[in-house]
Amino acid sequence: MAAEQVEDYCISFVEMKFINNTLYFVAENDEDLESDHFGKLEPKLSIIRNLNDQVLFINQGNQPVFEDMPDSDCSDNAPQTIFIIYMYKDSLTRGLAVTISVQCKKMSTLSCENKIVSFKEMNPPDNIDNEESDIIFFQRSVPGHDDKIQFESSLYKGYFLACKKENDLFKLILKKQDDNRDKSVMFTVQNQN
């Protein structure tokens, strides 16, 4: 019995260019190549909690805050407590790329523009033609914690969504993670669908 030849998935380069101290390769046939981007996949409806079991919700000022809330109140306040987590196909392998949105009166999507966490009134786009975005976070499991999740900003490497107490409120912020044991950047995500 003869062995089957496996088709090579190689790229043939026909030219090299140096532009601004960066070497670029020109492919002979680039129709199968995909540019760096995020492509929207299916959403999941989820409740997000910090490690104090406080529920993330959108307050009247459209700000993301955490509050003690029984499950029955989560259901009663579903438009403010149920988040739509859209998963995105990422052309690079860096974790599960997601956006976090909420449908209250209008669709709003979480942003970390200028390292400030807020909701922008917008639908998550179907495609983002870039390697980073203020609305894309990498959802990852926390090593050693089976049910804990972290959300790292795609725009600010090493910065994570975190819970921080300010005055009497527990706010969602963006924080540089200095320590792997920092529990403020850990969350549980309870899928609803």
Curated annotation (Swiss-Prot):
SUPFAM superfamilies: Cytokine (SSF50353)
Coiled coil: none
GO molecular function annotation: cytokine activity; interleukin-18 receptor binding
Protein name: Interleukin-18
A single GO BP: defense response to Gram-positive bacterium
Oligomeric form and interacting partners: Forms a ternary complex with ligand-binding receptor subunit IL18R1 and signaling receptor subunit IL18RAP at the plasma membrane. Mature IL18 first binds to IL18R1 forming a low affinity binary complex, which then interacts with IL18RAP to form a high affinity ternary complex that signals inside the cell. Interacts with cargo receptor TMED10; the interaction mediates the translocation from the cytoplasm into the ERGIC (endoplasmic reticulum-Golgi intermediate compartment) and thereby secretion.
Residues of the propeptide: 1-36
InterPro entries, per the entry: IL-18, IL-1_fam, IL1/FGF
Keyword Lyase: no
Similarity annotation: Belongs to the IL-1 family.
Entries under Pfam families matching the protein: IL1
Subcellular location as annotated: Cytoplasm, Cytosol; Secreted
Top-level taxon in the UniProt lineage: Eukaryota
GO cellular component, one term: extracellular space
PTM description: The pro-IL-18 precursor is processed by CASP1, CASP4 or CASP5 to yield its mature, active form. The pro-IL-18 precursor features autoinhibitory interactions between the propeptide and the post-cleavage-site region, preventing recognition by the IL18R1 receptor. Processing by CASP1, CASP4 or CASP5 induces conformational changes to generate critical receptor-binding sites. The mature form is then secreted and released in the extracellular milieu by passing through the gasdermin-D (GSDMD) pore. In contrast, cleavage by CASP3 inactivates IL18.
Site (Cleavage): D36, H37, D71, S72
PANTHER family documented for this protein: INTERLEUKIN-1 FAMILY MEMBER (PTHR10078), INTERLEUKIN-18 (PTHR10078:SF35)
UniProtKB keywords: Cytokine, Cytoplasm, Inflammatory response, Secreted
Known function: Pro-inflammatory cytokine primarily involved in epithelial barrier repair, polarized T-helper 1 (Th1) cell and natural killer (NK) cell immune responses. Upon binding to IL18R1 and IL18RAP, forms a signaling ternary complex which activates NF-kappa-B, triggering synthesis of inflammatory mediators. Synergizes with IL12/interleukin-12 to induce IFNG synthesis from T-helper 1 (Th1) cells and natural killer (NK) cells.
Keyword Transmembrane listed: no
